[in-house]
Structures are given as C-alpha cells and as structure tokens.
Amino acid sequence: MRGCGILVIVLALAGSVACAPTHAGAPQVPLRGIYGGIPQEVVASGRSLREFGIDAVWLGSGSFTAERLAWLRAQRVQAYAEFNTLHVADALTAHPDAAPVDADGRVSPPPDGWQGICPTHGAYRAERMRAFRELLERFAIDGVWLDYHHAHASWEQATPNMPDTCFCDRCLQRFQKATGVALPDAPTSERSALLLSTHRDAWVRWRLGVFTDWVREFRDIRNATRPGALLGTFHNPWSDDDLNRARVEKLAIDLKAQAAYIDVFSPMPYHARFGHAADPAWISRQVSWLGAHLGVRGVPGERLRIWPIVQVSDWGEPVPVGQIDEVLRRGARAPATGVMVFAWGGLRAHPQKIEAIGRTYRALAGSVPPAD
C-alpha cells in the first residue's frame, strides 16, 4: 500500500473492535472506514468523527505521537497503527547487502520505484522487530496492521512488475540448509534456473515459510507486549490461481499459513486501479474467494475477520461518484465484516464523494449487506 506513513481512518464496530461483545446469531454492523488521512473536513463541517460514523483510526507507525493519540481518544475513537515490514528503502544505506538479488546474480532494480528488502537479512529483520515492539510499548494502541509484507515487487497496478528474487548467497545457503536440496557450485544464473524449474516447488514453499515466519514473530511480540491488540495485514487481493499463482509464487504470501497468527485480513481489491473499473462486483468476488479459502463466513464469534480496503479515490482509472455506494457495499458483504475506503488524501478535493461515502456509511450502520 502506497504511503505507509500516512494516516488511516476506519469506522469500526461500536465500542472496542478488539473486544466488543456480540450476541450469538445477532447481525454484525460492518466496520466502515477511510484510509489516507484524518478527515478534518468532517470535523470542520461541525460533525464529530463519531457523528460521521468513525470510531477507529489507523496511523502510520511513524506518525504516532502522544498528542495525536490523546486527540483520537478525545474523539472517542479506537487507535490502530499501519506498520511497514519490507519496504523501508532507507535501510539499504546501512545494509546494502539487504537489496534483493535477481536470477542473474545482480541487485534487482526497484520495480517501478518500489524498493523491497531481502527477507533473510538478519539485521534488517531485527530492526523491524525492535521498531514493532517499541511501537506497542510506547503507545496504548488497539492493534497493528502489517503492510508491504511481500517480496520485492510492484503489484499495485493493472500490469504488475514482479521480478524473481532473492537469489543472494544468504538466501541460497538458507534454502539448502532448510530443504536438504543441494545446488551445484555454479554461477547464480545456473542455480536460480534450477530453483525456478527442477526445484521450483521446494523453492516456493521455502520462500512462503520465510515470510510467514516474520508474521509469527510479530505475533509473538504482540502477545508479549500488548496481548489485547489486534494483529492485521493489508495484503494482495488475488486468489491462489490469479495471474498464474503470482501471489503465492512471486509475492510469497501464504494466507492460510499466516492465518495462524493474523486476526484481521484486509485485502486490497482496488477495482479501478487493477483493471476492473466497470466491474465493482470483482470486489465481492475476491472477498468471497478469500472467505472460502480461510474458512471465514462473516458471522459473530469467528476468530478471523475480513475487512477489505476498497478504492474510491481516483488512482489511475477514476471512480465515479455514482459507483461509490456499490463499491462500499461490495466490500462490506459477507464474509467481510467491515470495509475501508482508499484513500482520503485523494478525496479532499471531491466533496461529493465525501458525502456519498457518508450516506453509505450511515446506511450500512443500520443494515447488514447480504452476500450473493
């Protein structure tokens, strides 16, 4: 998700999302939210965040201050953090060997400007875990959402750019030790060719495990530091089979394995951005697939929850005002129990869109959209 340091606003279930009680069989009011900046325009119009329907806010982890947290509490909203895992490009200054290596043995250029990090770099990982722990220790927040937790790639567009990585010596050594597969003493290009053909299944499984193990450690830190906080993830919305299994084989995202550690999945089905501008139903199809894949129905009492983030602001293809209601309702349908809007920063100059969001949010607050 672009702009990891920006604010995220989300409308959650009344009261604390993490522990709000529900009665067996009672319908759930869908979480309703906005990503991309505190909506000062709402407050300036004379409405509080709660009057507009907002009762939870996500800030980039680096944006939290005592003053901002106090302001959020004064507004009677929940406070959550968005946490960048593998996209801290500045870290390459101190750790140049953390740059992902391509199949030819060269440093892979940042695809379309997106700079990923080698997931086996121990010092980088330790720094991110330390930052995660310090965030939870310093601020009494209600949860943290992982972001950019995937391999070196630029996938947030209609035509993704996803190079094969990482084939650094460290990754190849760890792969061999973990799997027992012996690679020949040969140039990286020859070794990577074997990994992408003869040993592809073992290579894919190993990479998935590397990224999942990060999630396990984040969960352990959360449990030890602030166990009442939710652990969520903003993630790629494709099914296992979309784009030749690219989410699995290129991005190294194993949703089922991560489900052992994650509380809330927030897929990013940006329909207009991803080539489905005239087909908002694509949103609910992707969310429906995710629910079936994870065994989530969107009923009270489930441990796992799905809160998609959907595109309402213009990014690439425009999203017309007349489409907003359907986009939000598609995102909020079961198995989802919530929906967020992407992105407030692109909405400030469009008051008609803001009001359309408000109308749908208030309608959703009094109804449960059916699945079809």
Task: Walk through the language-model features, giving the residues of each.
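Active-site-adjacent "subsite" loops/lids of carbohydrate-active enzymes
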Residues: 80-139, 156, 188-200
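Catalytic domains of carbohydrate-active enzymes, especially glycoside hydrolases
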Residues: 33-67, 138-143, 258-264, 331-339
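Substrate-binding cleft/loops of secretory-pathway carbohydrate-active enzymes
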Residues: 225, 230-274, 319
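Aromatic-lined substrate-binding rim segments of carbohydrate-active enzymes
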Residues: 45-101, 205-225
